């Protein structure tokens, strides 16, 4: 049985960390994404996305067979959700715009959905009316099914123009009020879905929108969606397609920035970045040069893949050496667009892994990454790199966020950074009472410890300027459905999606409320007891 490494000594201030330890202009917020929270899949003129097709066609590949048809109904409860953000005293709220809600047919030529425009205008206006800054993601993986049908989505160069047009429409409609944009969320994760993960879209790239019948919304989220019989081959993908998708994501990002800087920058004065996922790639044997090199190579395949082109217009050397002609070249004009196409870097960090150049002895769980020629594992000599948050994948390693920030500073010219996602999940235990379900000590500890390491990185010169918890509320998790909960706010999936603050939400409010900008030991005024009452629902 695996044991766990002892918890490292936390940097000061450790468990007492709060807003006063950070500069006044440091941004604290929480994030969500459209498909995971909005629901209203067939309301307001929205068209289907690849996730709609996938979850209805392959419910067996979602852990509980559910889908995002209703998600957590934020489309209809957005004012309540914004009230929560205000009660918590957060500076900012990160959300994504649903491409098929704005452009149901995917392209401008197929028509603009004014109801979708109105929804996001209302959301943005409500945020600003409550002194909350919007941070808006343009693409959080919900490709319009229409574009997947027409030309296989991001497998085709054609999507670059359609994404540019979608982005331009968003700048035109919302850019007078939105000053902080994230073009693409986790392009590495999305690209890898083509060749690594068989159980996610765009596995469904061969499925046509005509097969997305309009089923009745699932009444109880734990029940699977209806299954529609089909003889269509869902299709498989090659490893080369992973890099083609990544290439087009980078070009789409650059095209969106070009249209903004050419047409909107002078009047709107917005800032841009991509949200890139990272892990601490810890050498299995730090005294073995081959393992150290393998860990560096793993970081390139995870983070450098999308960061290096923004610096030099080239992919990381280790990727070029490993992949050769399988990795496409950028043209001279494309390099010009890519270099410097960011104002800040979004960093999504959750966990860490060991990396080795050879298969670790007596480790049957080690995963070999063929293209990068390295192994990853969460275990060394029978000891886990960090405790597991649940049954899979998220080992809790707070030091890892510090190590990643230091590596980004050293390798990529010390860019301005926002932690755009950081959080931990608990398993959705349906046997717990509401009061029990809202006790999330693991999350409080996780956030305290990671924020302490973020502060340490800042004190050592890393230019971190903001931190967003993932996520504001429990939501429909991609692949996991309703089986895991990432939220500061508990959502009752079975009783009209009622929202209740967890212990972590109350802790975060008391430690990081915007009123605490001046004094380390100051607490927010208890102006709204409803939030601090442990068993009271947050009202509309």
Swiss-Prot record:
Amino acids binding a beta-D-glucoside: 36, 140, 185-186, 350, 421, 470, 486
Record GO cellular component, one term: cytosol
InterPro entries: Glyco_hydro_1, Glyco_hydro_1_N_CS, Glycoside_hydrolase_SF
Active site per database record: 186 (proton donor), 421 (nucleophile)
Pathway(s) annotated for this protein in UniProt: Alkaloid biosynthesis
Enzyme class, UniProt record, top EC level: hydrolase
A GO molecular function held by the record: beta-glucosidase activity
Chief subcellular location: cytoplasm
GO terms classed as biological process: glucan catabolic process; isoquinoline alkaloid biosynthetic process
Pfam family, one: Glyco_hydro_1
UniProt-annotated site: Controls the gate shape and acceptance of substrates, residues: 393
EC number: 3.2.1.-
Keywords carried by this UniProt record: Alkaloid metabolism, Cytoplasm, Glycosidase, Hydrolase
Catalysed reaction, written as an equation: deacetylipecoside + H2O = deacetylipecoside aglycone + D-glucose; deacetylisoipecoside + H2O = deacetylisoipecoside aglycone + D-glucose
Compartment(s): Cytoplasm, Cytosol
Listed SUPFAM superfamilies: (Trans)glycosidases
Function: Beta-glucosidase catalyzing deglucosylation on N-deacetylisoipecoside and N-deacetylipecoside.
Entry similarity comment: Belongs to the glycosyl hydrolase 1 family.
Name recorded for this polypeptide: Ipecac alkaloid beta-glucosidase 9
Gene for this chain: GLU9
């Amino acid at each position: 049985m695996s044991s766990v490494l002892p918890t490292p000594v936390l940097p000061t201030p450790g468990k007492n960390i709060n807003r006063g330890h950070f500069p006044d202009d440091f941004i604290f917020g929480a994030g969500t994404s459209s498909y995971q929270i909005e629901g209203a899949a067939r309301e307001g003129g929205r068209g289907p996305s690849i996730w709609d097709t996938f979850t209805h066609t392959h419910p067996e590949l979602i852990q509980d067979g559910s889908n995002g048809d209703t998600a957590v109904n934020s489309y209809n409860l957005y004012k309540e959700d914004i009230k929560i953000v205000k009660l918590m005293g957060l500076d900012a709220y990160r959300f994504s715009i649903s491409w098929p809600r704005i452009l149901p047919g995917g392209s401008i030529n197929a028509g603009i959905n004014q109801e979708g425009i109105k929804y996001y205008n209302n959301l943005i206006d409500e945020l600003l009316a409550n002194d909350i800054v919007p941070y808006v993601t343009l693409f959080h993986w919900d490709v319009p099914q229409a574009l997947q049908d027409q030309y296989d989505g991001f497998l085709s160069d054609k999507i670059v123009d359609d994404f540019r047009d979608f982005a331009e429409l968003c700048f035109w409609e919302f850019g007078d009020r939105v000053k902080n944009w994230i073009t693409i969320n986790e392009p590495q994760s999305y690209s890898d879905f083509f060749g690594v993960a068989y159980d996610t879209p765009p596995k469904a790239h061969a499925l046509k929108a005509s097969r997305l019948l309009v089923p009745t919304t699932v009444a109880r989220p734990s029940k699977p969606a209806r299954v529609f019989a089909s003889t269509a081959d869902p299709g498989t993908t090659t490893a080369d397609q992973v890099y083609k998708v990544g290439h087009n994501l980078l070009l789409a990002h650059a095209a969106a920035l070009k249209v903004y800087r050419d047409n909107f920058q002078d009047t709107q004065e917005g800032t841009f970045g991509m949200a890139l996922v990272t892990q601490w790639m810890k050498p299995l044997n730090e005294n073995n040069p081959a393992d150290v090199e393998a860990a560096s190579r793993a970081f390139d395949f995870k983070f450098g893949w999308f960061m290096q082109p923004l610096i030099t217009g080239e992919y990381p050397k280790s990727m070029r050496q490993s992949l050769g002609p399988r990795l496409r070249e950028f043209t001279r004009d494309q390099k010009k667009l890519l270099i410097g196409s960011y104002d800040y870097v979004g960093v999504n960090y959750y966990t860490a892994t060991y990396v080795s150049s050879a298969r670790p002895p007596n480790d049957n769980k080690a995963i070999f990454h063929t293209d990068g020629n390295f192994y990853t594992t969460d275990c060394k000599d029978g000891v886990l790199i960090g405790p597991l948050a649940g049954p899979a994948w998220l080992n809790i390693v707070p030091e890892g966020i510090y190590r990643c920030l230091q590596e980004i500073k050293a390798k990529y010219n010390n860019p301005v950074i926002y932690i755009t996602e950081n959080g931990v999940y608990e398993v959705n235990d349906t046997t717990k009472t509401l009061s029990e379900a809202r006790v999330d000590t693991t999350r409080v500890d996780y956030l305290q410890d990671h924020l302490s390491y973020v502060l340490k990185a800042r004190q050592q010169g890393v230019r971190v300027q903001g931190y967003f918890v993932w996520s504001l509320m429990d939501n429909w998790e991609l692949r996991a459905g309703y089986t895991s909960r990432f939220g500061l706010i508990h959502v009752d999936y079975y009783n009209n999606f009622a929202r209740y603050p967890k212990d972590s939400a109350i802790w975060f409010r008391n430690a990081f409320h915007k009123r605490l900008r001046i004094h380390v030991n100051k607490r927010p005024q208890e102006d709204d007891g409803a939030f601090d009452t442990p068993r009271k629902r947050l009202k509309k």
